[in-house]
Amino acid sequence: MSGLLCGYPMGAKTTSDFLDQGRLSVQEGKYLLAISNHPSPMFVLGYVMAQIALIPSMASPCPLWAVLAALYLPILPISILARCCYHYNRQTREEACPLAAQAAPEKTACFSFDTHMMSCFETMVKIGGYIMLFSILALYLTVFPFQMPPLLRPALLGSVEITTGIQMIASSVPGSMGALLIIGSAAFGGFSGIFQTKSVLKNAGLSIRHYMLWKILHSALSCLIFYVSRYGSLCLLLGVIHLLRRLAFALLRPHNAS
């Protein structure tokens, strides 16, 4: 919930903290990292929708439900797929809980307000620093002297830093293609978000490469769902969701059988 409500990278930070405190097993940490980092609803409602509304030559206004469905529905199939990949289920959680319960008192016996406050300051400085660094890199890409395909430069900007990238996509890519690039960028989180996530994982033993692969998959599914919701019917959108669900369960079934 912290990753969903607070945005990048709070889901990863909460997962890392709980893992360090022994409140989660390693399998739970890997599973939660795959599904807990997302743009917050406030960012989507206040910024993403505002930028989509500014896109020139949009044939029709982009409905809010299509954006929310594209960004948050992929969590369901990715959740099932992550359970399969990391062999996470209720039984393994129950087996890990006694060990976590024994380790937790040793790590959380002493509460220090100063330590927690400094941890918050450190996280804010890291997040702000990476946002500034990658925003500067995005500005360099806008004045890059070499010729690029028309959509490559905006796509690169969105993949570097989502706040700056989304704004530049909205001003340079007309029509529904601009909205599609914005959705893909918001779902991916940008390399700025990846570096922010890496900075808060600390020594939790979680793989940033796995996280990148999950975000790429999430971005692809978000683009697919948004495209279907804009150009297909509601029945087609439900069909795509049902297909993803069946595929995820098909991947999960051999593990359950074993």
Located regions from the model:
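Alpha-helical membrane segments and immediately flanking helix-loop junctions
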Residues: 1-53, 156-171, 179-204, 213-216
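Helix-coil boundary and interhelical linker segments in multi-pass alpha-helical membrane proteins
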Residues: 51-64, 172-176
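Alpha-helical transmembrane segments
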Residues: 63-80
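C-terminal transmembrane helix pair
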Residues: 42, 46, 72-76, 176-257
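Structural signal for alpha-helical transmembrane segments and their membrane-water exit/capping regions
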Residues: 80-85, 135-147, 240-258
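Intrinsically disordered, low-complexity non-transmembrane regions of multi-pass membrane transporters
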Residues: 87-118, 247, 251-258
